[in-house]
């Protein structure tokens, strides 16, 4: 297997997982580690969650997967209805994507299509330095080209506008000057 973020010539060590429960991954040999990445942010409720397991078992016996190209299914409809109840009233549509990278990719395409439909085609995005948006081509283009694992692709990706990222810590009081760079780039 050619795993992500490693070379085929000098591959990084991969640790075989034999079980997963809650936040823990059990490795071959019995060691347990905390999955701080939540399997690339896809298991935010933990592994082996009884409600999610039951839903998956129930669904797999009916329909494992269908594409949304002209067809749909009730679980997707039900999920979208629940999401819309949580959303502000002016948000009336839900687009389901199969990964964060694809969600970013589709969002960028939607923004481009929006301006094209208004007769004002645009091709640049304003984004923050030190951000990460995924591994698909367009998602990499709005990820910091200098300070990220995608710096190898600088010069090959479309160039966008990068503002300094805010420096206020997560628990600190917000400092409005943190987004001065963003304001300057936006008004340029």
PLM features: residue spans?
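N-terminal glycine-rich, Lys/His-bearing helix-loop that initiates the first secondary-structure elements
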Residues: 1-93
């Amino acid at each position: 297997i050619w795993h992500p973020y490693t070379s085929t010539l000098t591959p990084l060590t991969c640790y075989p997982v034999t079980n997963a429960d809650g936040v823990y991954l059990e490795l071959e040999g019995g060691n347990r580690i905390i999955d701080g990445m939540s399997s690339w942010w896809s298991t935010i409720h933990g592994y082996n969650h009884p409600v999610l397991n039951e839903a998956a078992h129930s669904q797999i016996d009916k329909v494992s997967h269908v594409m949304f190209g002209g067809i749909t299914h009730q679980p997707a409809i039900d999920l979208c209805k629940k999401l819309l109840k949580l959303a502000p009233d002016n948000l009336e549509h839900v687009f389901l994507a199969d990964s964060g990278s694809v969600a970013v990719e589709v969002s960028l395409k939607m923004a481009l299509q929006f301006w094209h439909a208004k007769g004002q085609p645009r091709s640049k995005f304003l984004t923050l330095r030190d951000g990460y948006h995924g591994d698909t081509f367009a998602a990499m283009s709005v990820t910091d080209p200098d300070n990220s694992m995608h710096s190898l692709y600088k010069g090959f990706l479309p160039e966008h506008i990068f503002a300094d990222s805010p420096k206020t810590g997560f628990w600190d009081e917000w400092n409005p000057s943190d987004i001065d760079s963003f304001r300057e780039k936006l008004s340029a």
